[in-house]
Each structure stands twice: as structure tokens, then as C-alpha cells.
């Protein structure tokens, strides 16, 4: 068969005319090295800081180091099978996580994917993990309380909605227990809770989930998990992901509470990433921006005003303020609060609850040290009744600590000193509280009233706990309506004072404990 050159050229021209190519601009690069979860990529000339880079098998890395001839990125997840020469590409997107009410009651990972085996999550949308905090004009002062249910905290170190209150102490001093009890106490308050577990054992997290479920608080809580077995990248990003989920409620005129357990482990994960990326180390080998790591996170916890909420919701929600309260946890080594990360977070937050191992081992639980625990803004948010009745507690404890130190060397003490020591011991005993047993405002008011007006003076020290249990049972049984109203209003006036006086007089006259 002989081919005609004219026919061939016509056929080629026809094919060329019919050929339609769709041009697609793709910013691609090649992996040049993989080590310890860090990949170096050649190419990607248009990549952004913090951009998600698409890897093979539907995985992602986050661009952190933008250098002259390469990009340093941290892999989100397993990296064992990544190899030199693999092609990657830019996505043009910053990391986002799902947000919405569908996350309540669920356990998710850093990327918002469910890990509790309860099926898909119906989210209301996505939110970037890194968001600029509300400005000065958009904020409102803190004047509403967050009740922890702990007498020692609500009376001496009150927390307000929109506040950042640090929980700091050595390992095994009850930091997580305080945070979990605070979540349990919110189940009827309308405050949505987010618990971010960073670098913890999976068994510990499972225990927390079980306790919240047993106490009926899981339905009101989102649990974000970056366990010890997760990559450093996911541990570093977990607090930001949890914060984005909490901001969903804050920006819609609702109240949310977020607990970061704990930011020491997040700082260690960030240090690991920074050293692997060959960033210059500073004090304690942390990178230079470790302060910014925590400040940009904790500044997002705020109380925002009505205009902010109205503008954000485009007029759907009017006349409501929103808040995100943060309780970051920091673990100290041998009580050293002057280390790098603890001092940073103390300077960022609005106060700290310092839990002391000596007090914890002595049986004072919660082991709050009233001397160096402080709340810088919570006083304005404290309920009126607790504020009025708890005024003398901190002073009594301070005087007791001072006198107790001298009393060790003095053999004979005068009556006034003995009385003060006895009062201090009884106040310390009264502030002790069991785990998973938060008290209402009214119950705290009854006990504080008993301390303030000397109803404990004739009660033996070893009988204080029994006295407390029997008194609360009596008050709730005989004055249920009054206790309910006092918890709701938190008010204090002559009428309430007389009622409290009547409860205690009747109780002491008719009850044994």
C-alpha cells in the first residue's frame, strides 16, 4: 500500500485542528530528603508559609521553612514510605479544621477526623487553625463567672468568662483533675467545653473520656487528641485546632471553655520540629519564637462585644457577647516556675493557679497554694455572695502559714495565737474537696458563711468533713428552693444573710455529725 504524502499532511493538519489541550498551572516540586518527619523539597517557588503541600496517598505536609533553593516542610502523619524523588504540589490552602455543633460529644484528632468509632461528623463548615485574635476595640471586659465547683478556686482565685487562667504545678499534683472537674461543672451552665490532650498516653485520654461520660459532661464537650504516639507536627498544631473549634461558639455569641493539657508538651514538640528544620536554638534549646507560639494562641481567648458578634453573624445574632475562656496547663520540674516556658505563659495569662506537690502529699486537695495563686481579672466576675463571704479566707490562710512556721519553735503560745492557728487549720480542712464532686454556688456560700461567722469554731478538726457533708445535705433537703435561687442569682443581701444564718443555727441545734 502506497501512502500519499498530501493525504498524510492533510490528516495531520486535521488532527492538530481537533486537538484541544487544557492548560493547567501547577506548582510542583520534588522531595530531596526525608528525615524524622521533616521533608526538604526542591521547587515549589510560589509556596506560602504554613501552606498545605499535597503528598502521595492523600497526605499533607505543612511548609514551615522557605529557603532560597528548597522548602522545609513537616509531614502531618506517617512518613516512613516517603522517598527521595517523589513529586509533591502546592494546594493554595492553609490548614483548616471542621467546626460546628456536630463535634460536641466526639473525640477527634488534630485534623478534626473522628477517632471514637461513632461514624461521620456533621460539621457546619471549616475554619483555619491560625486566626488573628480579636482587636482591642472588639473586646469586652470580663464580668461573668466560670464556676469550677472548687471552693478553693472559686473563693480565692475566681475565673471569668473570656479570661486566661494558667494551671501550673509539678507532675501528679492534680492539674488535669482540676480541669476535668471544671468541665463536669459546666454541664448545666450552657458553656461548651473543648479539651485538648497533647502528648498524653492513649490510656490516660481514654480514662478522661470515660469519666466525662459517667458524669454526663461528654455531650457538651469536644475532645481533641494528639497523643504521645502522634507526630510532633500534630502535637504542635492540636491547640490551634481546638481553639478554632472553640472560636466557632465565641463568634456566635456563646460561651466556650478550652483546656490545653498541656502546653509544656506542645513547646517540646515545637522545639523538636525547629531543631530538625535547623532553626537556631536559644534558651533551653527552644527556638526564638516560642513566646509567640503561646501568645498568639492564648490571645484568641477573649470576651468579644455585641458589635463583633453581630458583624460576624451578619446580623443574625444581636445583643449577645461571646467568650472563649482558656485554662492552659503547664508542668513544672521540681516546682521551678522560673523556667523558660512557665515564665512565658505566666506573663501571657491573666493569673495562675499554682498546685504544690508538698500540699498534695499532705492531703490538701486541690493543692492550691494561696500565696502565689492569683486571678488578675476574675475578681470583677466573682459572684456577689462568694466575694462577700470569702474575703477573709486568703488572709486567714496567710496568717496561719506565717504563725505555723513560728509555732514550731515556740513552746508556749498565747490564746489569740492558738485561736488563729486553730481557725487556719479549720479553713484549710474546709477547703479540701474530693474529685468529681463540684459544689454549686449556694453550697459554697453555706460553707463560707459557716467559716466567716465562726460556726466551725467548736467543731473538732477531724469532724470538719462530716460536718460539711451533713450540713450540705440538710441545706439542700430543707431549703431546696432557696439554694436553687441563690445558685442562679449569686446575690447577697440582708435577707439572704438571715436565711443562711437560720439554716446554720437550726442545723447546729438539731444535728449531730
From Swiss-Prot:
Q: Does the keyword Translocase apply?
A: yes
Which keywords belong to this entry?
ATP synthesis, ATP-binding, Cell inner membrane, Cell membrane, CF(1), Hydrogen ion transport, Ion transport, Membrane, Nucleotide-binding, Translocase, Transport
| The protein's Enzyme Commission number | 7.1.2.2
Keyword Endoplasmic reticulum on this protein?
Answer: no
Give the main location: membrane
Supply the enzyme class, top level: translocase
Recorded topology in the membrane: Peripheral membrane protein
InterPro entries, sorted:
ATP_synth_asu-like_sf, ATP_synth_asu_C, ATP_synth_asu_C_sf, ATP_synth_F1_a_nt-bd_dom, ATP_synth_F1_asu, ATPase_a/bsu_AS, ATPase_F1/V1/A1_a/bsu_N, ATPase_F1/V1/A1_a/bsu_N_sf
The residues that hold ATP are: 169-176
Q: Which GO terms describe its cellular component?
A: plasma membrane; proton-transporting ATP synthase complex
State the protein's purpose: Produces ATP from ADP in the presence of a proton gradient across the membrane. The alpha chain is a regulatory subunit.
Family affiliation: Belongs to the ATPase alpha/beta chains family.
Q: How does it assemble?
A: F-type ATPases have 2 components, CF(1) - the catalytic core - and CF(0) - the membrane proton channel. CF(1) has five subunits: alpha(3), beta(3), gamma(1), delta(1), epsilon(1). CF(0) has three main subunits: a(1), b(2) and c(9-12). The alpha and beta chains form an alternating ring which encloses part of the gamma chain. CF(1) is attached to CF(0) by a central stalk formed by the gamma and epsilon chains, while a peripheral stalk is formed by the delta and b chains.
Give the protein name, as stated in the record.
ATP synthase subunit alpha
Q: Which organism is it from?
A: Actinobacillus succinogenes (strain ATCC 55618 / DSM 22257 / CCUG 43843 / 130Z)
Amino acid at each position: 500500500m502506497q501512502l500519499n504524502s498530501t493525504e498524510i499532511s492533510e490528516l495531520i493538519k486535521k488532527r492538530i485542528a481537533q486537538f484541544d489541550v487544557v492548560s493547567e498551572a501547577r506548582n510542583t516540586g520534588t522531595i530531596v530528603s526525608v528525615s524524622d518527619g521533616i521533608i526538604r523539597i526542591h521547587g515549589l517557588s510560589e509556596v506560602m508559609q504554613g501552606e498545605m503541600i499535597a503528598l502521595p496517598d492523600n497526605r499533607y505536609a505543612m511548609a514551615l521553612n522557605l529557603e532560597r533553593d528548597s522548602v522545609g516542610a513537616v509531614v502531618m502523619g506517617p512518613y516512613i514510605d516517603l522517598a527521595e524523588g517523589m513529586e509533591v504540589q502546592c494546594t493554595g490552602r492553609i490548614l483548616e479544621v471542621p467546626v460546628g455543633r456536630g463535634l460536641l460529644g466526639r473525640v477527634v484528632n488534630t485534623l478534626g477526623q473522628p477517632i471514637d468509632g461513632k461514624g461521620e461528623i456533621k460539621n457546619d463548615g471549616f475554619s483555619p487553625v491560625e486566626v488573628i485574635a480579636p482587636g482591642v476595640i472588639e473586646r469586652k471586659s470580663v464580668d461573668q463567672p466560670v464556676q469550677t465547683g472548687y471552693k478553693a478556686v472559686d473563693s480565692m482565685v475566681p475565673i471569668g468568662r473570656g479570661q486566661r487562667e494558667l494551671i501550673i504545678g509539678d507532675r501528679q499534683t492534680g492539674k488535669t483533675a482540676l480541669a476535668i472537674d471544671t468541665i463536669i461543672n459546666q454541664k448545666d451552665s450552657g458553656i461548651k467545653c473543648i479539651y485538648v490532650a497533647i502528648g498524653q498516653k492513649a490510656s490516660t485520654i481514654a480514662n478522661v473520656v470515660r469519666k466525662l461520660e459517667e458524669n454526663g459532661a461528654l455531650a457538651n464537650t469536644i475532645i481533641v487528641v494528639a497523643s504521645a504516639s502522634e507526630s510532633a507536627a500534630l502535637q504542635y498544631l492540636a491547640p490551634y485546632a481546638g481553639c478554632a473549634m472553640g472560636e466557632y461558639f465565641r463568634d456566635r455569641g456563646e460561651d466556650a471553655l478550652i483546656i490545653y493539657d498541656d502546653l509544656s508538651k506542645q513547646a517540646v514538640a515545637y522545639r523538636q520540629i525547629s531543631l530538625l528544620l535547623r532553626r537556631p536554638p536559644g534558651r533551653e534549646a527552644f527556638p526564638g519564637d516560642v513566646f509567640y507560639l503561646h501568645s498568639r494562641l492564648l490571645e484568641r481567648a477573649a470576651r468579644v462585644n455585641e458589635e463583633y458578634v453581630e458583624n460576624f453573624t451578619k446580623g443574625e445574632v444581636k445583643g449577645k457577647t461571646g467568650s472563649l475562656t482558656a485554662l492552659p496547663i503547664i508542668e513544672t520540674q521540681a516546682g521551678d516556675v522560673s523556667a523558660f516556658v512557665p515564665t512565658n505563659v505566666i506573663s501571657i495569662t491573666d493569673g495562675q493557679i499554682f498546685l504544690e506537690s508538698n500540699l498534695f502529699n499532705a492531703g490538701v486537695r486541690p493543692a492550691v497554694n494561696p500565696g502565689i495563686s492569683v486571678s488578675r481579672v476574675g475578681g470583677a466576675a466573682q459572684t456577689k455572695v462568694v466575694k462577700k463571704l470569702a474575703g477573709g479566707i486568703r488572709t486567714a490562710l496567710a496568717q496561719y502559714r506565717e504563725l505555723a512556721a513560728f509555732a514550731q519553735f515556740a513552746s508556749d503560745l498565747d490564746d489569740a495565737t492558738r485561736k488563729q492557728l486553730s481557725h487556719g487549720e479549720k479553713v484549710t480542712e474546709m477547703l479540701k474537696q474530693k474529685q468529681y464532686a463540684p459544689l454549686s454556688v449556694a453550697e459554697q456560700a453555706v460553707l463560707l458563711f459557716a467559716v466567716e461567722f465562726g460556726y466551725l469554731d467548736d467543731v473538732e478538726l477531724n469532724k470538719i468533713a462530716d460536718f460539711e457533708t451533713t450540713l450540705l445535705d440538710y441545706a439542700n433537703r430543707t431549703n431546696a428552693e432557696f439554694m436553687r435561687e441563690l445558685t442562679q442569682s449569686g446575690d447577697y443581701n440582708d435577707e439572704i444573710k438571715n436565711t443562711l444564718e437560720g439554716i446554720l443555727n437550726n442545723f447546729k441545734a438539731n444535728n449531730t455529725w
